Amino acid sequence: MTQRPAPETGEQAPDFDLRDQHGQRVRLSSYRGRKVVVLMFYPYAFSRVCTGELRKVRDDHPELVSDSVQLLAVSCDPTFALREFADRQDLAFPLLSDFWPHGEVASAYGVFDPERGCANRSTFIIDTDGVVRWAVHNAMPDARDLAEQGRVLAELTGPLE
């Protein structure tokens, strides 16, 4: 598996088909023409920073989970671990497993860390045409700025009602 460079703003987002925590297939291109996608890669289910971020999304950022926006959170954890993680944290949005082939989607987005065997903490906002409109990459221990993501989404989708 070859690590590609991360897609730049204005480029087509690589399509993928992954299973969520319930074993359901989720294909990025199925949202084209319907929803803006917030694609959040995170290193590990159950880790302190990742758990805190996803709980913050659940509690404080409804703009990341709405009728016009679809949040897809991706890690290299197996689906069974993601199911337990979602259940324990009461996470209703899709947690996608990039477990096998291990890190294939993270590699397509240029965010796979082969030494740690996980995705780096990165976010891509993808418009309804499947084009990357914003991306940010954070260091492993640093939580992402969810408020900034909200501002970018407001520019793409309009203010929350």
Residue ranges of predicted features:
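Chalcogenol-based redox active-site neighborhoods
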Residues: 1-161
